[in-house]
């Protein structure tokens, strides 16, 4: 009789245990970018870091996306621990129903809250060694590859207009994925790429073809109305000094659906695992607490708690 009672108790405990474990596990959906992009790779790295840093208590499911606008729009229908990446400026545009969010304003956009910055979209103007180009004016008469439909292509086209090069360069009809071979065989003199640094295609171009990344002047950066960014010396082969360029900050956001404890855990784990992520992928090395300045809207209270604990500087709108 006693044995049967103990057996029943053990069965009861075993039945409850999986449910208890499931309750303690935090599940997060992380909406990223196209699966072929560096930002999708970053999302996978963050997912692994969260699992390792939380001893398995945080499980991140990475979802592919067609871009930042889609990520923001999905806030309307998503509930719970939905995390997504986007340039901070898109949150302000969404709230105001402007640009790509015209006639799409929704109260849910007011519930978006920032967690932490990730590597910025960094502009690279890459010129071949053979071209001899060392500044923007030298691009006149050259063949340049911008690509199509991407942020880098749109931004590159904008800069050509801003800096007086519209109609003065030949735009190559080559896919951006073929930029390095086209540069090496002389089909193009240069290409424009936007991505976190160090960018794989720029690494290859610099190492195998002696390509040079152009620096922008202070005036050019001001004209672009983008965020200034310095690519440290030695990032690319043959780069003896820092490169001044522009960037579009990117941040991981959640909504007020996420409780403070989860937001705190995600933020704390991200920063505590950043050094190990940097060892595996250099693009994390450029992320710092100073990049909180790029967040234009509210920070999640749970994330803010962590930033206050480490003495990070927060703005009044945070």
Model-flagged regions — what are they?
Residues 17-24:
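Sec/Tat signal peptide C-region and signal peptidase I cleavage site
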Residues 82-119:
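Acidic, polar ligand-binding/catalytic clefts
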Residues 87, 96-99, 104-105, 167-256:
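Pocket-lining segment of extracytoplasmic ligand-binding domains
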